């Protein structure tokens, strides 16, 4: 056993890993099997949660077959497509272990980059990662950069990649913050409220890979406008809460 592996085991006694999924029938088996390999090496108590957001393809059925083969895998189903934020909420709600990690079920991240983050949880409460050499089209890159800058400006945060789907949390955080967002703003709200509560956040870079199957969602104009509206609403809400706390 290597020194790093020993550190990783001491850093966590239990971890929940979940994957938000929408129409990922061609990716979810590979992503889950890779996670099982990585997590078994940690020799820790773990669970894997697949959150199927009302997929119109066979994602839900495939996820159930995976769970039937492995008792450490469970599936949460949305009857209809509720959106990314609601899918994250379902994952956090279903998680039962001391640490919670999530990454998307599209295979654009390598979950083997998660274990080196575990020793950081001795000093921090959240590890918020950022994409190295982001493998998306130019429009998504520009949208992501502008969104992150706007969020950081409004909430006074210094986060490099606010919506990077590779984050590790202490489970207790979700018992101590009230989340109002149900849409694309959930990542932002978690970090903003965690900072307000005094939780410690660190950041690390992770590699990002091209999508090899399925279709990206979430970048259409309707979703962007709705997220912008939610952002302003959340900013007003948290600013009002801060004024009450200071008075």
Q: What do the PLM-derived regions correspond to, one by one?
A:
Residues 46-49, 60-94:
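Conserved donor nucleotide-binding strand/loop of the catalytic core
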